[in-house]
């Protein structure tokens, strides 16, 4: 049995772990490897999110942990997602106690409405609140999700053959970031409530995304198409667009049980872990919005790993990738004892970091804890 170190939130002295084995003792027996207790690490990282970023006066998460109280709509959706991750993993009401406060604060900060100019931002909030509804059965979350879904569907037009636009007033710009999450949302709404129209929306959005913004040979997801010019931006390839395309394929696979969807997800995942990395670790995509990109990929990559019909050799390869990234972040990229993460998972951020970068790190550590709990990661 492997020994595990418990990482406590109040840890004072940084601890370091070695992936390699120690020298074999004189008696010829190898010492046991020391491994990370991902459950404890996730507790530490997710509580840090609350302790260092939560704005108790406004009931939302601040932009950084250094006093910038600027409200950002879409990162707050992912902060709720992390709280739900932690609550589902532990059952600890210390996490769920923030759900209602988040609901009140985020809506108030967004002008006392869930409506927003950016369709992708509304999609992220709808996805997070759909999860909140599932774990609480509180209908206010369901009502908010359905309200948002109504706004989101208004973003579809026939420019560039279909797709949901990125931003109100920019009907010509059709982006992967506004269609991947929308397809996931539509599919999950169908699975939750059984509305056939939602299933058709999921098929339609996914079909447009795959045929328009995905390289069929490599699985790379292109960023956007300008319907005024017909030009596709093939230079911008980001981990979060890869992730939401993977996520939408997995959700449709769950509905139809057709392996073709799983194959789509695998192709996109293989491209990501082969091309958007540095030495097998997801590369930095900067701060600000980019700080969240890797965490979004990790969330939907984890969903793919959990699929029972995923070929065993592929699953093992993906688990090795996850383990390497999580160990690298925890051992090389985490400021201890504060448990802070930066955009580069091989580099500690110091004492200050942004909400988006912290969220991506939290998502990775929570994913490792989930996979460990399911006895997939060892």
Predicted feature residues:
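Oxyanion-binding "anion nests"
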Residues: 241-256, 260-277
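Alpha-helical scaffold segments in carbohydrate-active enzymes
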Residues: 48, 85, 105, 131, ...
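Extended ligand-binding groove/face enriched in aromatic
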Residues: 96-192, 199-200
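Bacterial Sec-dependent N-terminal signal peptides
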Residues: 13-40, 44
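Sec-dependent bacterial lipoprotein signal peptides
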Residues: 1-17
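CBM-like carbohydrate-recognition segments
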Residues: 33-80, 86-120, 132, 136, ...
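Active-site cradle of extracellular carbohydrate-active enzymes
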Residues: 186-189, 198-249
């Amino acid at each position: 049995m492997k020994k595990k170190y418990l990482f406590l939130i109040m840890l004072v002295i940084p601890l370091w772990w070695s992936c390699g084995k120690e020298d074999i003792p004189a008696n010829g027996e190898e010492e046991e490897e020391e491994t990370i207790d991902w459950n404890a690490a996730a507790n530490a990282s997710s509580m840090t999110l609350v302790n260092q970023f939560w704005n108790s006066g406004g009931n939302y998460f601040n932009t950084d942990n250094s006093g910038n109280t600027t409200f950002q709509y879409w990162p707050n959706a992912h902060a709720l997602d992390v709280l739900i991750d932690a609550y589902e993993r532990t059952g600890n009401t210390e996490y769920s106690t923030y759900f209602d406060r988040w609901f009140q604060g985020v809506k108030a900060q967004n002008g006392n409405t869930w409506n927003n100019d950016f369709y992708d931002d509304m999609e992220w909030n709808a996805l997070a609140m759909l999860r909140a509804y599932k774990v609480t059965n509180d209908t206010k979350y369901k009502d908010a999700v359905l309200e948002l879904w109504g706004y989101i569907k208004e973003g579809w037009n026939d420019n560039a053959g279909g797709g949901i636009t990125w931003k109100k007033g920019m009907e010509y710009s059709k982006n992967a970031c506004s269609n991947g999450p929308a397809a996931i949302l539509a599919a999950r709404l169908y699975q939750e409530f059984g509305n056939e129209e939602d299933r058709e929306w999921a098929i339609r959005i996914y079909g447009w995304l795959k045929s328009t913004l995905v390289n069929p040979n490599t699985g790379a997801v292109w960023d956007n198409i300008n319907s005024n010019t017909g030009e596709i931006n093939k230079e911008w390839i980001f981990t979060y667009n890869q992730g939401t395309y993977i996520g939408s394929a997995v959700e449709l696979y769950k509905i139809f049980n057709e392996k073709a969807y799983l194959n789509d997800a695998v192709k996109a995942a293989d491209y990501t872990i082969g091309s958007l990395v540095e030495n097998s670790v997801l590369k930095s995509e900067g701060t600000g919005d980019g700080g969240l990109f890797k965490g979004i990929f990790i969330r939907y990559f984890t969903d793919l790993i959990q699929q029972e019909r995923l070929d065993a050799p592929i699953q093992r390869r993906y688990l090795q990738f996850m383990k390497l990234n999580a160990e690298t972040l925890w051992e090389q990229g985490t400021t201890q004892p504060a448990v802070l993460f930066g955009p580069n998972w091989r580099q500690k951020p110091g004492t200050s970091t942004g909400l988006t970068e912290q969220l991506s790190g939290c998502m990775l550590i929570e994913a490792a804890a989930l996979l460990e709990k399911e006895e997939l990661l060892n």
